[in-house]
């Protein structure tokens, strides 16, 4: 396939989601390792829920770890390990690799979207899906809608539109026959 056909081949939403799930198997252990950074701040003992540092530690680790993970992989090669498994790559609209600014912005927007989804659904569940749950559930659904390939004729996600990027499907590489 030529460069033009690679950059125009659209990645399906299912493959994007599956690549994200694969990435979670890397991000969750990385978050556990990142939590070790906080041990010296508590005399080498794990920080437990009653500790005043606990909310700060949890939120900082949960937000920064995936942002750094995605920024690094998207900047270095346009692919995370999950994306590589599904032959997906993130490129500029011109088909070139992402800049560090685009990678970081895209990672922050992804984590922000996921946070809105989580907060919205958690609040809706806590309110037993009553009338008061309409606003948080609506925010969650809007964020989820924005992550999907639903905008414009090109079916790009909101994150793609804001960062001037897109996820493309790479061609299947033929293995040489022996």
Outline where the language-model segments fall:
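Membrane-interfacial and juxtamembrane segments of integral membrane proteins
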Residues: 1-178
């Amino acid at each position: 396939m030529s460069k033009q056909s690679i950059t125009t081949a659209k990645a399906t939403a299912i493959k994007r989601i599956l690549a994200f799930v694969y990435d979670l198997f890397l991000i969750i252990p990385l978050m556990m390792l990142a939590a070790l950074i906080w041990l010296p701040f508590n005399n080498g003992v794990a920080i437990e829920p009653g500790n005043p540092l606990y909310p700060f530690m949890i939120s900082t680790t949960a937000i920064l770890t995936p942002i750094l993970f995605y920024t690094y992989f998207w900047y270095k090669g346009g692919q995370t390990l999950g994306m590589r498994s599904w032959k997906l790559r993130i490129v500029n609209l011109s088909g070139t690799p992402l800049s560090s600014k685009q990678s970081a912005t895209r990672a922050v927007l992804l984590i922000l979207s996921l946070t809105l989804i989580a907060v919205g659904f958690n609040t809706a569940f806590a309110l037993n899906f009553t009338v008061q749950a309409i606003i948080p559930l609506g925010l969650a659904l809007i964020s989820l809608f924005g992550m999907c390939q639903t905008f414009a004729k090109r079916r790009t996600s909101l994150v793609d539109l804001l960062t001037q990027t897109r996820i493309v499907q790479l061609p299947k590489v033929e293995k040489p026959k022996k």
